[in-house]
């Protein structure tokens, strides 16, 4: 238990993913990012074309394995790289790139099942969209949830439909709520992704997104900073002056405010975002990940604050 917050080690003031995993498994857990070779429904014409305007050619899997290689090969290569830094640990296989339930169940099984048989794999994390959860897929996920440690990561990005339309998400909020409900019916852990710094969004709008997530039946959150990569459709918006990058100070203050309204039990899987430096358009300060994390820690300490301090349910209890 931390000095300031019950769901953290040492001086952390928010519910870290690392804390959660070490408490659950008693050791270091690596998240091994894989590319299952999927597409997205707003890229392939199922619901739209072009994809999300912020999304890279790698489908937001810029640090995932090589999709040209079999899943087992990707897994072993990334595992070996991780063990160059850490000597021991077990693994969560993370299907990160594109939409990882956008295929028939038979295809999903071909992708997921082999990696679950790898030595040391204790769980599975699947990144997808709320409009790619048909009943048969949810039933398969429910079955997986009975035999491995499962998370489904659902991209929300923003609760504001005007922004969602601008970035070509091609789904509405009701679809998101429905997706969460389908998964939670089977007690599947859900991690919601949000992005700070989207075009046209101000502080109040970004806080509204965090406050809405705080009310959802989701067990985790990933807070991303919008970082612009070369080759993404959003570069054109940036060149037209439709996008301004957040400063590090503004981002730090916003994230601390967002943490304060989240329930303390909600696991914070990520609290910033970065991309390959050779593809980065901006903001360049985001590549210094540890500095960003340290500034968030320092600001929470300066405020004598912590995750959930302003959460209504936490205050009432």
PLM regions with names:
Residues 1-92:
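N-terminal [4Fe-4S]-dependent radical SAM core
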Residues 2-19, 28-30, 220, 228-317:
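Auxiliary Fe-S-binding modules of radical SAM enzymes
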Residues 30-34, 91-93, 124-126, 150-154, ...:
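Hydrophobic faces of well-ordered beta-strands that scaffold small-molecule active sites
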Residues 41-42, 63-64, 102-103, 276-280:
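Short catalytic/ligand-binding loop motif for oxyanion handling, primarily in non-cytosolic enzymes
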Residues 52, 114-121, 208-222, 292-307:
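Structural recognition of alpha->loop->beta junctions
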Residues 61-69, 97-110, 124-186, 196-216, ...:
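Conserved non-cysteine loop/helix-boundary elements of the Radical SAM core domain that shape
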Residues 77-118, 123:
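A contiguous, low-structure linker/loop signature
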Residues 118-121, 179-190, 216, 254-266:
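A structural motif corresponding to the C-terminal end of an alpha-helix
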């Amino acid at each position: 238990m931390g000095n300031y917050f019950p769901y953290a080690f040492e001086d952390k003031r928010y519910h870290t993913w690392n804390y959660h995993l070490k408490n659950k498994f008693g050791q270091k857990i690596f998240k091994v990012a894989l590319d299952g070779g999927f597409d997205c429904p707003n890229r392939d014409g199922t619901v739209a074309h072009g994809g999300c305007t912020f999304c890279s050619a790698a489908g937001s899997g810029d640090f995932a394995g090589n999709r040209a290689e079999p899943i087992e090969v990707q897994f072993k290569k990334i595992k070996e790289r991780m063990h160059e830094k850490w000597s021991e640990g077990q693994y969560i296989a993370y299907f990160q790139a594109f939409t990882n339930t956008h295929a028939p169940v038979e295809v999903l099984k071909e992708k997921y099942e082999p990696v679950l048989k790898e030595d040391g794999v204790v769980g599975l994390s699947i990144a997808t969209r709320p409009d790619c959860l048909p009943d048969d897929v949810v039933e398969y996920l429910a079955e997986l949830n009975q035999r491995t440690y499962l998370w489904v990561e659902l991209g929300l990005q923003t609760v504001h439909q005007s922004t969602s339309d601008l970035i070509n998400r091609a789904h509405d909020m009701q679809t998101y709520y429905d997706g969460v409900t389908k998964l939670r019916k089977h007690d599947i852990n859900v991690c919601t992704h949000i992005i700070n710094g989207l075009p046209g969004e101000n502080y109040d709008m970004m806080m509204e997104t965090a406050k809405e997530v705080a009310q959802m039946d989701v067990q985790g959150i990933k807070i991303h900073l919008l970082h612009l990569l070369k080759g993404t459709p959003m570069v054109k918006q940036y060149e037209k002056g439709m996008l301004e990058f957040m400063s590090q100070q503004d981002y730090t203050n916003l994230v601390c405010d967002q943490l304060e309204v989240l329930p303390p039990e909600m696991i914070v899987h990520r609290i910033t975002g970065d991309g390959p430096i050779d593809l980065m358009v901006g903001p360049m300060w985001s590549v210094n990940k540890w500095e960003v994390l340290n500034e968030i820690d320092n600001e929470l300490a300066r405020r004598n604050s912590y995750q959930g301090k302003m959460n209504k349910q936490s205050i009432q209890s």
